[in-house]
Amino acid sequence: MFTGIVQKQGKIITIKKESKSWRFEVEADKFLKDVKKGDSIAVNGVCTTIVDFEKNKFAFEAIEETLKKTNFKKLKKGSLVNLEKSIKWNEKIDGHFVQGHVDETGKIIYIKNDKKRTRITISLSKEMRPFVAYKGSISINGISLTISDVEDKNFSVDIIPHTLKNTNFSQLKRNDIVNIEADMIARYLHKIITTK
C-alpha cells in the first residue's frame, strides 16, 4: 500500500527485454538507504518488487500483463520515474490510499501552465468513468491528486509548482501516456451500489 506522495525521482539506466518479462534498472541514489530485496516500491504508481539492488540502484521486473496495463513499454534509458516506498502502519498518511494496481493508461490531451498551477487534461475510458468524480481522489503516475474537472471522455487535475518540480510531471507533454488508478473507496462503493 502507498499514499501517492512521491519520495524520489529515479532514472531508468537499463532495460532488458525478455520473452515473458522486461527487467528495469533504476538509479535512485539515497532513496535505497533502508530497503532490501523483496521490498515493494511504487514505480510510476505500479507496485513492483525489488529483485536486486546496490547502493544507488535497484532492479524490478514487469510481466506481460503489467506491460499491457501500464506505461512501462514507453520507458526508455534516461526516463524519469516517480518512486515511493510502501507505507508502514505507524506512518502519517498525507495523500490517499494507493494500491499500486493500475487500472488503465490515459493520454495527455492538453497542458495549460500559469504561475500558480498547471492543468493537465487526460483521456478517460467509459469503464473508468464511474470512479472519477469532481473533487475526488485519483492516482496519476503514482501521484495522489484531486480531480478538478470531469467530462465524458476526459478529466483534469491541477498541479502545484512543488509537485511539478519534484515529479516526472515536469517532463510530460501532449500525447504522453500516464498510469491511472482509481480511488479504492470509489471502486468499493460502486461495487456495493451496483451489486444486488
Q: What do the PLM-derived regions correspond to, one by one?
A:
Residues 1-196:
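Conserved loop->alpha-helix
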